[in-house]
A protein has these predicted regions:
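Short, acidic Ser/Thr/Gly-rich low-complexity loop/linker segments typical of extracellular
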Residues: 221-237
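Hydrophobic beta-strand segments
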Residues: 212-219, 250
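Flanking helices and flexible, charged tails adjoining ferredoxin-like Fe-S electron-transfer domains
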Residues: 31-68, 79, 97-103, 107-207
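Extracellular beta-sheet/turn segments enriched in Thr/Pro/Gly and aliphatic residues
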Residues: 180-186, 262-279
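Exposed aromatic-hydrophobic patches
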Residues: 95-97, 235-241, 274-275
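A structural signal for beta-strand boundary/capping segments at domain termini and interdomain linkers
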Residues: 78, 210, 259-261
Length: 279
């Protein structure tokens, strides 16, 4: 049977929070038995978009990471409270409404913090992937439907097909572990890797001019690992570098000019090299 999976693309998300608003619109004040009790207006987010930064001034990049219930195939909450979990054949994981009532310990059973506590109704709650809508013929849950740039998408496929999709699209879970989440991420490098950024310029008659189309090479331990050309603004960037990956050498080459090299160390943070002058 086909299972339902959510894919979240970090390169596409701009932090508009439409997914959060759509979830609130669907569940606040609305009881969808036997799927879920109504959500309270404040203090509870079944889907949450958080802001992260890479780099430091004067060059930083912002990445928005949307998190929700992972609908894990091997869910930690299910291991702790098997009687409170309703695992559907399509892979959607629901909380049993009766078993969740008064069971605040369910909140701590999720290692990702995605089970919430409704203080008004004294019940544990979480994302249902809008199962009540999908069962009624909807193609997408509200969060996916509301995403203007398709940073969120739903996929219906077999486990084997999804495994192939993971390899082809280089999908990864947000956290390492053996819980086998049904929610996977694309372009996770925007969160957990570093970049090297800089610019190539030339001083002409006391005017500093950006140099477009200049070759820039990146080496590690005297081995060439990447290369690029500067853009219209004379800027270059090397990305997807592992944290604490060592001392890199950036070399700038342009016909008719002496090559310029500079070392830069990549630790926990991305690095901005500033301007490299060619003469």
């Amino acid at each position: 049977m086909d299972k339902k999976h959510i894919i979240i693309d970090l390169e596409k998300c701009i932090g508009c929070f439409n997914c959060m608003l759509a979830c609130t619109d669907e569940f606040v004040g609305n009881r969808w038995a036997p799927y879920s009790e109504k959500q309270i207006l404040t203090g509870e987010k079944w889907i949450d978009t958080r802001r992260y930064e890479r780099g430091k001034a004067p060059y930083t990049e912002v990445t928005f990471v949307t998190q929700t219930c992972r609908h894990c195939a091997k869910a930690a909450c299910e291991k702790t409270f098997p009687q409170a979990i309703d695992r559907r054949e399509d892979g959607v994981v629901l909380l049993d409404m009766k078993a969740a009532k008064g069971n605040k310990a369910l909140v701590d059973a999720c290692p990702y913090g995605m089970i919430k506590w409704n203080e008004e109704l004294m019940t544990a709650q979480k994302c249902t992937m809008c199962a009540h809508l999908l069962d009624d013929g909807w193609e997408e849950p509200r969060c996916v439907q509301a995403c203007p740039l398709r940073a969120l998408s739903i996929v219906r496929c077999t486990d084997e097909e999804f495994t192939e999709m993971i390899d082809n699209l280089k999908l990864k879970p947000l956290e390492e572990g053996d819980n086998r989440p049904q929610v996977m991420y694309r372009n996770l490098y925007r969160l957990n890797s570093c970049f090297i950024k800089g610019a190539v310029v030339r001083k002409e008659n006391d005017i500093i001019r950006a140099q477009e189309g200049v070759d820039v090479q990146l080496s590690l331990n005297d081995e060439l690992i990447d290369y690029t050309k500067t853009d219209f603004f004379g800027e270059f960037k090397f990305d997807r570098l592992p944290k604490d990956s060592g001392v890199f050498k950036v070399t700038v080459k342009k016909d008719g000019f002496a090559s310029v090299s500079k070392e830069v160390t990549v630790g926990e943070e991305s690095q901005f090299m500033g301007e490299l002058y060619i003469e």
